[in-house]
Swiss-Prot record:
Native source species: Mesostigma viride (Green alga)
Protein name per Swiss-Prot or TrEMBL: Photosystem II CP47 reaction center protein
Gene3D superfamilies according to UniProt: Photosystem II CP47 reaction center protein
GO biological process: photosynthetic electron transport in photosystem II
Gene name tied to this protein: psbB
Superkingdom: Eukaryota
């Protein structure tokens, strides 16, 4: 059969046995990819510095998803928090990757078996003897089984009743770890940042799926509904399945990009809105002010700020700063973070504290402007020095560092002050190693950005796929040009006059 590449699935349209075979093979390919990709990422992942070189800076894609489900240990003797371990067991990165590859092999064998033994009695309608699938019953079976899985995940895995729990963190991504979750059954369960909602919603959705599955197994659709929704056509199944997938892809694109309890910043990196809103900057300043109010010096207050929190407050970790066509991990852009230099405080010669205006997300270059506490421009780095009135040299700006590696150091040299003013545009100032990976200095996106972009593209593609296959199954008679109820009347040679049932030819 000379089919074009986009029509090859036609061969399994009316062949239930081989339809199952290709689906098993597809599941095996997905499972094999997941296991293989996990092993690849483990081979290139550096677990030595979970604070300044976390998985999302290294461009890991599979590892964050494994970690959020409760996997945190490796056969390499490390865990995700940088500690040494002795007995990781099967529930480890390598253990789960290996089980996926083994599953892929079993799926491959099962697919081969179903391809060879395609003509099973199970797939034949006992009334007609022709290949047929009881699609409403199959729908009920799948709904029941997926409901069981959903309920089991929420009731056992997430709650820790039989499982590790999931990754839970504080709002600022400092204290994250794997722990059991208590289901939230109140209105707070609908808060997208409340992990308790993950448990309760899986339990509730699982129960609903089980009940709906039992309903569809025990109640047959009316003939009118069966005909109206084309329940006898396997392309109806394809169309509605694609609808479920594209809807899920749109939803997870949103929860990833805007952030949620299921997409913690310790595993996927911060969101762009946390930079836009000064989320970490406000928290850092709040902690510093509280420390100073309790009697600490500025140096002591800034030294208490966790390096992890300071690193989040850096524009290079904003997923919207990396272009969609800049391939590679964040570390391939600005380099591997080596250390926090400390918080830079600028002052003019009159003693006023100045604040560098931070670069907005969608700027590649931005003027260096220093403002006082009232928002008045006091200094800048001018484009045309001949007309400048607020240059660093004219205003006499100095910079002092609190906390970090340069704690207590002050610079008054205009060249050095300008260097740190430019870097302060990008948030907290860090030192980067650009030599090790030959980093090019151009920002990259995090797995959060890549996941969102990929799933939005696939969701759009699958949306059109749903429309296409839905239209094909609903309007099949229109596209064929023949009413399915008139097939005998228009059969060539059945009647003396085409379409006239009163002129049927007599068999000789």
């Amino acid at each position: 059969m000379g089919l074009p590449w986009y029509r090859v699935h036609t061969v399994v349209l009316n062949d239930p046995g081989r339809l199952i075979s290709v689906h098993i093979m597809h599941t095996g390919l997905v499972s094999g990819w997941a296991g293989s990709m996990a092993f690849y990422e483990l081979a290139v992942f550096d677990p030595s510095d979970p604070v300044l070189n976390p998985m999302w800076r290294q461009g890991m894609f599979v590892l964050p998803f494994m970690t959020r489900l409760g996997i945190s240990k490796s056969w390499g003797g490390w865990d995700i928090n940088g500690d040494s371990i002795t007995d990781p067991g099967l529930w480890s990165y390598e253990g789960v990757a290996a089980t996926h590859i083994i599953l892929a092999g079993l799926m491959f064998l099962a697919s081969m078996w179903h391809w060879v033994y395609w003509d099973l009695e199970l797939f034949r309608d006992p009334r007609t003897g022709k290949p047929a699938l009881d699609l409403p019953k199959i729908f009920g079976i799948h709904l029941f089984l997926s409901g069981l899985l959903c309920f089991g995940f929420g009731a056992f895995h997430v709650t820790g009743l039989f499982g590790p729990g999931i990754w839970v963190s504080d709002p600022y991504g400092i204290t994250g770890r794997v722990q059991p979750i208590e289901p939230s059954w109140g209105a707070d369960g609908f808060d997208p940042f409340n992990p308790g909602g993950i448990a309760s919603h899986h339990i509730a959705a699982g129960i609903l799926g089980i009940l709906a599955g039992l309903f569809h197994l025990s109640v047959r659709p009316s003939f009118r509904l069966y005909k109206a929704l084309r329940m006898g056509n396997v392309e109806t199944v394809l169309s509605s399945s694609i609808a479920a997938v594209f809807w899920a892809a749109f939803v997870v694109s949103g929860t990833m990009w805007y952030g949620s309890a299921a997409t913690p910043i310790e595993l996927f990196g911060p969101t762009r809105y946390q930079w836009d809103l000064g989320y970490f900057n406000k928290e850092i300043n709040k902690r510093v002010q509280a420390s100073i109010a309790s009697g600490s010096t500025a140096s002591e207050a800034w030294s208490r700020i966790p390096e992890k929190l300071a690193f989040y407050d850096y524009i290079g970790n904003n997923p919207a700063k990396g272009g969609l066509f800049r391939a590679g991990a964040m570390n391939n852009g600005d380099g591997i973070a080596a250390g926090w230099l400390g918080h830079a405080v600028f002052k003019d010669k009159e003693g006023r504290e100045l604040f560098v205006r931070r670069m907005p997300t969608f700027f590649e270059t931005f003027p260096v402007v220093l403002l006082d506490k009232d928002g008045i421009v006091r200094a800048d780095i001018p484009f045309r020095r001949a007309e400048s009135k607020y240059s660093i040299e004219q205003v006499g700006v100095s910079v002092a560092f609190y906390g970090g590696e340069l704690d207590g150091v002050t610079f008054k040299d205009p060249t050095t002050v300008k260097k740190y003013a430019r870097r302060a545009q990008l948030g907290e100032i860090f030192e980067f190693d650009r030599a090790r990976l030959k980093s090019d200095g151009v920002f990259r996106s995090s797995p959060r950005g890549w996941f969102t972009f990929g799933h939005l593209c696939f969701a759009l593609l699958f949306f059109f796929g749903h429309i296409w296959h839905g239209a094909r199954t609903i309007f099949r008679d229109v596209f064929a040009g023949i009413d399915p109820d008139l097939d005998e009347q228009v059969e060539f040679g059945a009647f003396q006059k085409l379409g006239d049932a009163s002129t049927r030819k007599q068999a000789v």
